[in-house]
Each structure stands twice: as C-alpha cells, then as structure tokens.
Swiss-Prot record:
Subcellular location: Cell membrane
Main location: membrane
Membrane-topology annotation of the record: Multi-pass membrane protein
Single GO cellular component term: plasma membrane
Gene: MFSD13A
Cytoplasmic side: 44-55, 119-126, 180-191, 293-305, 351-358, 430-466
Intervals, Extracellular compartment: 1-11, 75-100, 152-155, 224-264, 326-330, 394-402, 486-517
InterPro entries: MFS_trans_sf (IPR036259), TMEM180 (IPR040035)
Native species: Homo sapiens (Human)
Residues annotated as transmembrane: 12-43, 56-74, 101-118, 127-151, 156-179, 192-223, 265-292, 306-325, 331-350, 359-393, 403-429, 467-485
Induction: Up-regulated under low-oxygen conditions.
Protein name in UniProt: Transmembrane protein 180
C-alpha cells in the first residue's frame, strides 16, 4: 500500500507536468556540459590545439546536418498529401512512436554525457567521438520533445501551458550549474566525476519514468471514452488511419524542399531566427569578456561567477512571465515587444556611455536574459508553422520533427558566425586579436575569467571602449533586422485562427489536446 500511493500520485500527474519534466532531465546534463567540456579536455586531458580544432570542425558539420537528417528519417512517411490505403498509423500511434523514441534516446544521452568525464581513449579521438555522440542523442531528444509540443496540443493556450512547464523544469535543471561549483576541481577530478555520474543516473531514470507515464496516458486515450488524461478534439479514441502503407506515393526530399521554399512565413521566420540564434550565442561567447573589461574592476570574481550562473537560470524564470503574456496578447505581439525592448535598452545604454556602471551591469544581465527568453518563445512559433505546413500542403499528418530540423539547419550557422564576427569586429575596431592574447577562458570554463595580462595603459581605454560598442551596437543591429523580418511574418491574428480551424477540419481524427487537470 505504501508503494501504491506514490504510484497513484505519479499516474495522476497532469500530462503537461510529465511533458515538462523531460526538459529537466535534459537541462541538468546540458548546462554542465556547456560549462565544463572545453575546460575538461584542455586543462585536464591536455588535448593539443590541432586535435581540438579538428574535433570542433567535425562537430560543427555534424551539428548542422543531424537535425534535418534525423527529422527526415523520423517524419518522411507523414509528408504525402495523397490518400493512402492499407495498414497505417493513427495519431495516437505517432505520439507513441515519439514517446518511445524519447524513452530510448534519453538514457543514451545520459550515457554519452558520462563519456566526457572518464578518459578512455586518446584525448583528440575521445573529444571527437564524445561530441558527435552527445550531440546526436541531444538532437534526437530535442526533435522528438519539440515535435510532441505540436502533436499533443493544437490550441495556442494549451501549447503555451506545455511550454510553461518546460520553462519551469528547465529553471530547476539549471540549478545543476550552481551545484557543480562545489565539485569542480581540475587537480582532483574524482568528486566532479561522481557528481556527473549522479546527474546522468538521475537523468536516465527520469527519462524512463516520464516516458512510461506519457505512454500510459496515450494508451488510456483509446480505452477510456472520456480520455481522462488527454482530451480528444475529434476522435483520438478511435483508430482512424493517418499514414498508410509504404507502397503509396511518397514525397521526395527535393519536393519537400520546394514546398518549404514556397512557404513564405517559414522563410521570414528562419531569417529572423538566424539573427536570434546569432545574438544568443554572441551573448554567451562574449559574456565573460564584457564582465572582464567593463565590470571586473568593480565586482569580485565570485560575483562574476554568480552572474554567470544566474544568466543560465533567469531566462527560464523570466519566460514564465512571458508565457503568461503570450496567453493574453499572443506570441507574435510578445516577441515584437521584446525586439522593441532590446532596441530601446540598447539605445539608452549607448547614450548613457560605459561609465554608468549600475546601468551597465543591469544591461549586460538583461540583454542575455531577454535574448535567451525570446529564443525559448520561438518554439511556439515553429509549432504554428507546423500547422500551416500541414494545411498548405494537405498533409495526412504534421511533420513536426522534420520542420524543427529544417529550422535548425538554416539557423544553426548563427552559432558559428557569432564568435567569428564578434572577434573580427573587436579586432577591426581596437586592433586587439583575442587569438594572439588569450584574455578569457572559453565559455565552457567554470571560472568566467582568469587574471589577464596587464595591457599597456594606452591600450586599455581603447579595448574597453571597443567592448562597450560591441555590447550595444550588436543588439541594435539585430533588433532592427528582426523588427523588419518579423513585420513580414503574417501567421498571427486572423490568419493563425484560420490555420487552426482548417487544421481541425482537415484532421478531425488526428489531433490530441492537453487537458489541464
């Protein structure tokens, strides 16, 4: 009886809570990975420079290609608009397939995370294999998790509700960053290794438990006429066919790409999101540099470390408020407001100058928090694009994972452009080359900055001024570009309501929706 009560409590959890918990099991691993993997291989395993850059180059290519590759392999059977016959998949079966994939790939992600912290091969080979394995499983988990957001709910309100719990659990998962400081020690790596084992075991078991709960919810939808865990918009409890046999005519990759090229809102969205991804990674890459050259004389090293940790947690907490605004005003209006806020704060900081330290500190923190928060809201926009893609091309099932993968393919180059363009602009303006004088550790370091070599007195003001203009002019430029591209995006208001209505009409037997219990 003692075991029955916790089990009954778990089975009674709302679907949105179970779905959101998957973000926790990813976040507790990924934030620690981002902070420490570079420092581990450079400082602990002593990887040489050539092996490091070869690994990063291969990783860059793999990271760009695996999203559309895995999305295509997952969803290509859903693309045909032709009627199909024979044995097929119901909407429930599609969701079950995604949940089953998460049940496999989640524990494998945890296992690949462990492979970073134990030396088992030459450093260069281990670096390459670990990065590719980890990113591959992370991509599979992210694609299916995001695809479920589009498959479990259709209404904007319910998708916002699902995303609310993702942000809540992601914020909780980000606390692993703070805990990691107590264990990180490059000289004695055993305690940090044990900490990572604990995280990996917790994450793997969490994925197994959460996916089992989701699977039971979806299977109960067929047996329970009331569908207590999941509400059926139009007949999920039945077994209507969505996807037929492989003998039916399938769409080719070339035809799918041509359809995307005609999808106007998709093109405007990825143009805007490319700038957003660039800005997010620019902030991540240069956050330690800005702290060092603009604030290090006025704040302690421990304060900088706390600011770095808070910068991982605050966007998730802030996103909870943004999501409440989305329910009231819609995602389009909130995102547009955030772009205007970014532009206004940047112009204010530019006019104030680098000597207003309290305003500067607030701007550095808020710039990262609001930018990261915007990135997290854009997942909701992609789910709307999934709906529009289904309606425009009369698909038998929404190709959610594939569309998320195609968005990633177009926008991930922003990750590469951010450090390249940032270092080039700094060198162009100040003559200071970060590659020749390493003033900061990589963002993956546990410590935001080491003691830098003292620059010549004449250089210091120029470098500080260059960092300041980089800090404010990049957000201004990004905001202007994004306001233009976002103004061309029409999937909001009446058009969005029309798309939602048409999707319901086209797929009355296909759509799951979340019941808030």
């Amino acid at each position: 009886m003692g075991l029955g009560q916790p089990q009954a409590w778990l089975l009674g959890l709302p679907t949105a809570v179970v779905y959101g918990s998957l973000a926790l099991f990813t976040t507790i691993l990924h934030n620690v990975f981002l902070l420490y993997y570079v420092d581990t291989f450079v400082s602990v395993y002593k990887i040489n420079k050539m092996a490091f850059w070869v690994g990063e180059t291969v990783f860059l290519l793999w990271n760009s290609l695996n999203d559309p590759l895995f999305g295509w392999l997952s969803d290509r059977q859903f693309l045909s608009s032709q009627p199909r016959s024979g044995a097929g998949l119901s909407s429930r079966a599609v969701v079950l397939a995604r949940v089953q994939a998460l049940g496999w790939h989640g524990p494998l992600l945890a296992l690949s995370f462990l492979a970073f912290w134990v030396p088992w091969a030459p450093a260069g080979l281990q670096f390459l294999l670990c990065l590719c394995l980890y990113d591959g499983f992370l991509t599979l988990v992210d694609l299916h998790h995001h695809a479920l957001l589009a498959d479990l709910a259709l209404s904007a309100h319910d998708r916002t509700h699902l995303n609310f719990y993702c942000s809540l659990f992601s914020a909780a998962g980000s606390l692993s960053v703070f805990a990691s400081y107590a264990f990180w020690n490059k000289e004695d790596f055993s305690s940090f290794r044990a900490f990572c084992v604990t995280l990996a075991v917790s994450s793997g078991l969490g994925f197994l438990g959460a996916t089992q709960l989701l699977r039971r919810r979806v299977e109960a939808a067929r047996k329970d006429p009331g569908c207590s865990g999941l509400v059926v918009d139009s007949g999920l409890c039945g077994e209507e066919l969505l996807v037929g046999s492989e003998e039916a005519d399938s769409i080719t990759l070339g035809r799918y790409l041509r359809q995307l090229a005609r999808h106007r809102n998709f093109l405007w969205f990825v143009s805007m999101d490319l700038v957003q991804v660039f800005h997010c990674h620019f902030n991540s890459n240069f956050f330690p540099l800005f702290l060092e050259h603009l604030l290090s004389d006025h704040i302690s090293l421990s304060t900088g470390s706390i600011l770095l940790g808070l910068s991982y947690v605050a966007p998730h907490l802030n996103n909870l408020y943004f999501l409440s605004l989305c329910r009231r005003w819609g995602v389009y209006a909130v995102v547009r407001g955030l772009f205007l806020l970014k532009l206004g704060l940047s112009l204010l900081m530019l006019l104030a100058g680098p000597d207003h330290l309290s305003l500067l500190c607030l701007f550095i923190a808020s710039n990262r928090v609001f930018t990261e928060g915007t990135c997290k809201l854009l997942t909701l926009v992609v789910t709307d694009l999934v709906d529009e893609d289904l309606v425009l091309n009369h698909r038998k099932q929404a190709a959610s994972a594939l569309l998320f993968g195609m968005v990633a393919l177009v926008t991930k180059p922003g990750q590469t452009f951010a450090p390249l363009l940032g270092t080039w602009l700094l060198c162009f303006y100040t003559g200071h080359d970060l590659f020749q004088q390493s003033l900061i550790t990589p963002v993956g370091s546990a410590h935001p900055w080491p003691e830098p070599p003292a620059p010549a007195p004449a250089q210091a003001p120029t470098l500080r001024q260059g960092c300041f203009y980089l800090l404010v002019l990049v957000p201004i430029t990004c905001a202007l570009l994004q306001l233009f591209t976002w103004s061309q995006f029409t999937l909001h208001g009446r058009r969005l309501h029309m798309v939602k209505a048409q999707r319901q009409n086209l797929s009355q037997a296909q759509t799951l929706d979340v019941k808030m219990v």
